[in-house]
């Protein structure tokens, strides 16, 4: 499918494809699909996305753990690297940031094994989600 390419205003190296059509999931019906596959899985695109995302958190928000959902582990690893960079006034400078992925139980609920619970319990957690569904009524 051919889509329209949209570039980020914050980082012109970041781009996504938007495809018009009818896309149905178990929970929603959408008129457009935003393809962020390249952003999640390509080295250079994931790095650029992480640099851009890190700008929002580097100087204001402490992050102990990044929880990666929807296949966003590559992006999460780059994000942790950029958040922990040793820069002036960075909140997470030289910090060891955990990057984890939960499991799912048979009902589709998130499950953190015993060895991961200390990384999320009473911690500053950043959820990295690559699935968004916008619902509204007119």
What are these regions (language model features)?
Residues 1-138:
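PRPP-associated nucleotide enzymes
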């Amino acid at each position: 499918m051919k889509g329209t390419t949209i570039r980020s205003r914050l980082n012109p190296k970041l781009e996504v494809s938007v495809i018009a059509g009818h896309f149905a999931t178990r929970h929603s019906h959408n008129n457009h699909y935003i393809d962020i596959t390249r952003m999640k899985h390509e080295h250079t695109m994931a790095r650029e996305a992480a640099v851009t995302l890190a700008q929002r958190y580097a100087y204001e928000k402490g992050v102990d753990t990044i929880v990666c959902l929807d296949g966003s582990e590559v992006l999460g690893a780059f994000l942790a690297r950029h958040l922990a960079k040793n820069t002036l006034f960075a909140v997470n400078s030289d910090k060891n940031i955990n990057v984890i992925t939960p499991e799912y139980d048979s009902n589709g609920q998130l499950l953190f094994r015993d060895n991961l619970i200390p990384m999320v319990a009473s911690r500053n957690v950043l959820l990295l989600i690559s699935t968004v569904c916008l619902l509204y009524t007119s």
